[in-house]
Amino acid sequence: MTQPSPPPSPTPPDWPCCGHGTTPENPVGCRGVHVSGHTACLAHLADADRDAYLAGLTPGTDIDHRGTPFTASLLASLLDAVRDPTTGHPHLGVTRFGSATFQELAWFESVTFEGAGFESVTFEGAASFASATFHFGAAFRQTTFQEGAVFTSATFPGSAWFMSASFQKGVAFRSVTFRGNAEFLSATFEGKALFESATFQGNAEFRSATFQDNAWFDSATFQSGADFRLATFEGKALFESATFQSGAEFRSATFEGNAWFESAIFQSGAGFRSATFRGSARFASTAFGGHAAFDSATFVGDVWFTSATFERDVVFWRAAFERSVSLGPLVCGGRVRLSGAVFSGPVTLSIAALRLECRRTRWLSTAALRLRYATVDFAHAVFEYPLTITAEATPFVLADGRPVAEQVLADVVDTRVRIASLRGVDAAHLVLADVDLSWCLFTGTVHLDQLRLEGTCSFDAVPSRIQRRRWRPVWFTQRRTLAEEHHWRASQRTAVRGWNVAVLGAGHVGPAQMAPVYRALRKAFEDGKNEPGAADFYYGEMGAA
């Protein structure tokens, strides 16, 4: 909605102004700067004086028309006076339009500006700068566009300043090239904001900007930093197939509508810390080449990371997921960090990663974790509904039948899924399938006797059958054993070779702590009708006792 014009300021401008049309309500009158050699602005010059002034202009002339009110015909006369006969397009030198008012259509298409100053200008009609070229900077600070604005295919070889600009209707920056910095700090976009296929070679600054309608950045390229911190997207935020070649920051941004980053490429770091996604968050087929941070983010709507690829760590520390979540299938060449996150709805995680960290993660509904390669730390995780951790032997398959590519894990030979810790977990609703438990720390786990083990779940074993303690041979009966027992026995003065002392996080655990663990696992195996496994843990229980 177009905002009403503010009342005239009683304070005169910093330049000698025209003063035409003064009234008690407007003691300053026209604020247009004097045309050189005259005491009136361009709009209020006598016709003969205006014609003489325009006739004296040549392409590339510097002009100063600050505060001047322009009609469409007056602007057309000015641009015709500086039209370059070689190109057929107007060519302005350093141009000063600060605080001017363009009362009708402002047509600057294909104009070349050696320097453009449009600070605090009001465009009451539509404004078009399509295919314009702004050499040595373009300043639109605190400028108001009351109708549509078009910058399609414009080129900004220098910096472009749109800080606190107000676009009250739609604005199009399609296919624009910003070679310098593009600064839209605290800008307000009340209508649609179209930046499709725009190229930002310098920094793109949208910090604290407000997009009240849909914002399109599809296929845009950000070659330097992209800063959207504290930005608010009230409509859709569309960054599909956008490329971020340097760091991208969306810290504390708010997405009221859908946020779509499908097939986007983040070649460096991507920061979404403390961001809020109230609509759906789509990161399907998105590629993250650097560190990806979603810590303390809030996801109110649905979340998709199908076929997303992370070359390094991705962090969801203390993130909140309020609805159903489908994370994956995704592939991560580093760690997926979900520690402290809260999942309020049903969860399906399909993850191929080196490590999955879920320390103190809260699961408030059912959860299914399908994993490849990962070492999983589940210490002190909280879940009150069934939770299943399953190791997948083959690559994940998408809905269309295509396997998920795992190039970032191509050098990893061992595809086993290992559980590193279940300490502090209530295992009453936990199901483990086909996972390696040889490194798993169990002491401190509650209701371990209700743990369900399915498929092939492997434990560590005692050392090979014959070892020597000093000169005497020592025989070991082969059985399943806990990582804590390995650590404790390897720490004894009389330990034989084969016990593993390097069990990370085992701490000070002895027979008194291990005996109840063996007892609970024995019962779990007995309830699962696995008598040989139960016998192994019976021997462990007796040995600890």
Task: Please tell me what each predicted stretch does.
Residues 6-14, 18, 29-36, 52-512, ...:
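Tandem repeat scaffolds
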Residues 20-23, 30, 44:
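Short Cys/His-rich metal-coordination motifs, predominantly Zn2+-binding knuckles/fingers
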Residues 25, 37, 48:
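Cys/His-rich zinc-coordinating "finger/knuckle" motifs
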Residues 35-44:
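Cysteine-rich micro-motifs
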Residues 452, 515, 519, 531-539:
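Conserved positions within tetratricopeptide repeat
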Residues 502-508, 532-545:
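Cytosolic-side membrane-insertion boundary helix
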